[in-house]
UniProtKB/Swiss-Prot annotation:
Matching SUPFAM superfamilies: Rhodanese/Cell cycle control phosphatase
NCBIfam families referenced in this protein's UniProt entry, alphabetically: PRK00142.1-4
Ranges where the record places region Disordered: 288-309
Keyword entries, A-Z: Oxidoreductase, tRNA processing
Domain of life: Bacteria
Name this protein carries in UniProt: tRNA uridine(34) hydroxylase
All residue ranges annotated as the Rhodanese domain in the record: 129-223
Main function: Catalyzes oxygen-dependent 5-hydroxyuridine (ho5U) modification at position 34 in tRNAs.
Bilayer-spanning residue ranges: none
Active-site residues, Swiss-Prot/TrEMBL: 183
Gene for this chain: trhO
Length: 309
């Protein structure tokens, strides 16, 4: 990746807002032009239910983008988490139109009007430490594998679409309990609370700003977070204070890897890792090895490798 100038670190903004956008299609081209004109890269998703995305650029450009989005009818009060990166973590800018800004696949769920109760990061420890509270990680299992809250339940989902089925299967376990949910930036758990409330549960809570806001605001010595938080860009993970983490990504299967997994005999950079080794053939590994060789050659020539990110 192309290094950023030391005097201008890259500003990363993870943002979302559930709001009724009847003419969301018309926002696509102007938003893309606005971002591209300021060197902003990343992805923004637009749907009838609102906006979601992560973008990066100079501090000035990101501030201008947030102001621009909040000036759009219905999008004031955008939920934003800021962090920094030493290099630009995205390859290009994309603005996409979707059926949902976070895909659950359940009709008639409206987080804008029926989400659970927000819990500020400063109050989160007290809630999840209460006897009888069930704490649910609404992220996918590959994200959970490198970090989660102490005592949290992992539904072991491969995608957010599987979450409603998990809730239905464990409905009896939730009865009569406080249900506290969390996710990376707040969007999935906010939608999850709306779904759980639609089933008749009342004591439903979610971490405002998600794990990212918690790691930003809660000191490490007081934290109940264990491990690192997976993020969907080239940083791979962040830790307390939103410092870039130590996790790396298997370029063969896209699974995040901890430091111990990187020492596994089944790990080869760009070729395989403990999570995908058994699922690959020798032919697959030979193909990935050749791709990795090309990546390393490009890096040696000072070029920026691109392998689909």
């Amino acid at each position: 990746m192309t290094p950023s100038a030391p005097s201008q670190p890259v500003r990363v903004a993870a943002l979302y807002r559930f709001a009724r956008l009847d003419a969301f299609e018309a926002l696509r081209a102007p938003l893309a032009a606005f971002c591209c004109g300021r060197g902003i890269k990343g992805t923004l998703l637009l749907a009838h239910e609102g906006i979601n995305g992560t973008v990066a650029g100079s501090e000035e450009a990101i501030a201008e983008l947030i102001d621009h989005i909040e000036a759009i009818d219905g999008l004031a009060g955008l939920e934003v988490k800021f962090s920094s990166a030493t290099d630009m973590p995205f390859h290009r800018m994309k603005v996409r139109l979707k059926r949902e800004i976070v895909t659950m696949g359940v009709e008639d769920i409206d987080p804008a009007t029926s989400a659970g109760t927000y819990v500020a990061p400063a109050d989160w420890n007290a809630l999840i430490s209460e006897p009888g509270t069930i704490v649910i990680d609404t992220r996918n299992t590959y994200e959970v594998s490198i970090g989660t809250f102490k005592g949290a339940v992992d539904p072991a989902t491969a995608s957010f679409r599987e979450f409603p089925a998990w809730v239905e299967a464990h409905r009896a376990e939730l009865e009569g309990r406080k249900v506290a949910m969390f996710c990376t930036g707040g969007i999935r758990c906010e939608k999850a609370t709306a779904y759980v409330k639609s089933l008749g549960f009342e004591d439903v809570f979610h971490l405002k700003g998600g794990i990212l806001k918690y790691l930003e605001e809660v000191p490490a010595e007081q934290s109940l977070w264990q491990g690192e938080c997976f993020v969907f860009d080239e940083r791979v993970s962040v830790s307390h204070g939103l410092a870039e983490g130590d996790a790396e990504l298997c370029r063969a299967c896209r699974h995040p890897l901890t430091a111990s997994e990187l020492t596994s005999p089944r790990y080869a950079a760009g070729v395989s890792c403990p999570h995908c080794f058994d699922a690959r053939t020798d032919e697959d590994r030979q193909r990935y090895a050749e791709r990795q060789r090309q990546v390393e050659l490009a890096q040696a020539r000072g070029k920026r490798p691109h392998i689909g990110s």
